[in-house]
Amino acid sequence: MEHLVLTIDDSRTMRDMLRLTLTGAGFRVVQANDGAHGLEVLEAENPDLVVTDINMPIMDGFGFIEHARRLSAHRVTPILVLTTEANAEKKARARRAGATGWIVKPFNPEKLVTVLRKVAP
């Protein structure tokens, strides 16, 4: 069964790269351009996994994770952070919010796919 992945990033280029990588690995992909849009897609599409950036307009990745974890249907949905941030404080904040893991951009496509398959329900 193909897992459905929600990718959230304000960069169209990054969304395109994620779609290409993940569909090539057999995942189905839905996308959002910020955390607020991500919450709409999360509730409408009910993805199996989420990959989110941190630094985005309207609602950042921390806000998205915190809101997603308040939704009973997504309390345990794996949420990976994919960001240029390497700051230990931000990484700890993401974990406290409920992130499953953290990958720093630029990402290695094979590593991302491996991690997603590992945490997939």
Spans of features found by a protein language model:
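C-terminal output helix
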Residues: F107-L116
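Active-site residues of response regulator receiver
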Residues: D53, T83
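Receiver (REC) domain active-site loop signature in two-component systems and cognate sites
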Residues: M56
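Short, glycine/charged-rich "phosphate-handling" switch motifs in NTP-dependent
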Residues: T100
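Conserved acidic segment of CheY-like receiver
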Residues: E2-T13, L18-L22, V50
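Active-site beta3 strand of CheY-like receiver
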Residues: E45-V51
